[in-house]
């Protein structure tokens, strides 16, 4: 019985030490990292859209001068949230900030149209 165990253990040691078994983990496929993934592409696209909305922030903030203080306060808060979301690069925060900015911009446009 001991002889059988020692033969089996020796054979197993020889098989595990062979180059076939030792090189198995080295042949793994590696993904190319030079091209952006779909998540990175969507995040970059959303960040660019949010930056363009932030570029319009000063114009819309000046437009609220003759409107209710609600608009001025809301646009400043939305602008700060958008800047924070851009720094964090979190998709959820960026999409929420983009939605808030678009919503307040539309509200300001409607308020200005109804006023003038």
Swiss-Prot record:
Pfam families: CompInhib_SCIN. Residues 62-79 are annotated as: Essential for activity. Gene3D superfamilies: 1.20.1270.10. It is found in: Secreted. Its main location: secreted. InterPro entries: HSP70_C_sf, SCIN. Residues 1-31 form the signal peptide. Keywords: Secreted, Signal, Virulence. GO terms for cellular component: extracellular region. Belongs to the SCIN family. Involved in countering the first line of host defense mechanisms. Efficiently inhibits opsonization, phagocytosis and killing of S.aureus by human neutrophils. Acts by binding and stabilizing human C3 convertases (C4b2a and C3bBb), leading to their inactivation. The convertases are no longer able to cleave complement C3, therefore preventing further C3b deposition on the bacterial surface and phagocytosis of the bacterium. Also prevents C5a-induced neutrophil responses. This is Staphylococcal complement inhibitor. It comes from Staphylococcus aureus (strain MRSA252).
């Amino acid at each position: 019985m001991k002889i059988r165990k020692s033969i089996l253990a020796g054979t197993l040691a020889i098989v595990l030490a062979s180059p076939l078994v030792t090189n198995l983990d080295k042949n793994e496929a590696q993904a190319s990292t030079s091209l952006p993934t779909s998540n990175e592409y969507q995040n970059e696209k959303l960040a660019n859209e949010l930056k363009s909305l932030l570029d319009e922030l000063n114009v819309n903030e000046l437009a609220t001068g003759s409107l209710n203080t609600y608009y001025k306060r809301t646009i400043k808060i939305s602008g700060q949230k958008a800047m924070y979301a851009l720094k964090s690069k979190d998709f959820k925060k960026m999409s929420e900030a983009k939605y808030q900015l678009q919503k307040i911009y539309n509200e300001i446009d409607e308020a200005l149209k109804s006023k003038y």
